[in-house]
């Protein structure tokens, strides 16, 4: 296939044992579904992020999907827009490849039955017609935010790499922080994992890992354009009740 079409990407759509998923990667599949869909806590995301960025990166290329045609994750079934936004931030900034199943941007969340992960009126069994234009006019869509995330990814080489992921300590389990650097492009990400309440914490940046000398450093928030001065122990507060962009900071460090 690659002799005629080298741009083709083979995706292993397999949620199975880690050994089998890794074997598919070694056999030639360029990308794979991952367990990100079920990693929700700070500890789970940190451990899994380290695994795919360092532990298995020589042969396993993860694709972080926020949902799939088969999986309507429990954490999305409340329909809270902030949860959809924060999961999109995580998926789009932790790894170079991410994906979603149509309807995510419209906050589709109804489950077929309580305790299950199957979508109500699943598109696997019927043709679905979605009113994207109408949702856009009513402001009931995450599409502009998703487009913004993809524009940020396109503009920043650091977010197009897998192995440069570094996590940083925070004083709260409700907020996760990590960084990615490629040359002079240094991006820091702070995400509120609580979609319902404002959370604040101190982020303890590993300055050596960031490659920054000195104390204070200037950053620009790529989501809202705000300029801020941060330091090795930065207090941040993120309120999901504000526009969806404020579930997170995605900042570029001015080097």
Feature map (PLM): residue ranges:
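Substrate-binding/catalytic cleft of secreted carbohydrate-active enzymes
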Residues: 12, 33-50, 75
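Structural preference for beta-strand elements that scaffold enzyme active sites
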Residues: 7-11, 30-32, 61-64, 98-99
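Carbohydrate-interacting/catalytic domains
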Residues: 3-5, 22-30, 43-58, 100, ...
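Active-site neighborhood of glycoside hydrolase catalytic domains
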Residues: 1-21
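Hydrophobic targeting/anchoring helices
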Residues: 85-101, 110-113
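Active-site clefts of carbohydrate-active enzymes
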Residues: 57-81
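Short, glycine/acidic-rich beta->alpha junctions
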Residues: 80-84, 170
